[in-house]
Amino acid sequence: MSVKIRLMRLGAKKKPFYRVVVSDSRVQRDGKFIEHVGFYDPMVPCGEPGFLKIDAERLSYWLGVGAQPTDRVSWFIKKGFVEVRPAGA
């Protein structure tokens, strides 16, 4: 089973809101998920409170066991919006 850390779209038309979830890569984007690790609201300006909230401890755990982040989740990590620590540190 290949596991991905991806965004699950919620909200209304033209007012998106996303959950950051861990799910099997074979499941559709808005289908079943293993764990909910955070949220992302693109309607809030970048860097302000409420823009992005991810449980860094759980994200580090899932990355440590081999979960692959999608492009957007990787971008959040690279830009420093989420501080990822090595598992067990």
UniProtKB/Swiss-Prot annotation:
Similarity annotation: Belongs to the bacterial ribosomal protein bS16 family.
GO cellular component, one term: cytoplasm
Protein name: Small ribosomal subunit protein bS16
GO molecular function: structural constituent of ribosome
Organism this protein belongs to: Anaplasma marginale (strain Florida)
Keyword Zinc-finger: no
One Gene Ontology biological process: translation
Keywords: Ribonucleoprotein, Ribosomal protein
Entries under Gene3D superfamilies matching the protein: 3.30.1320.10
InterPro entries listed in its UniProt record: Ribosomal_bS16, Ribosomal_bS16_dom_sf
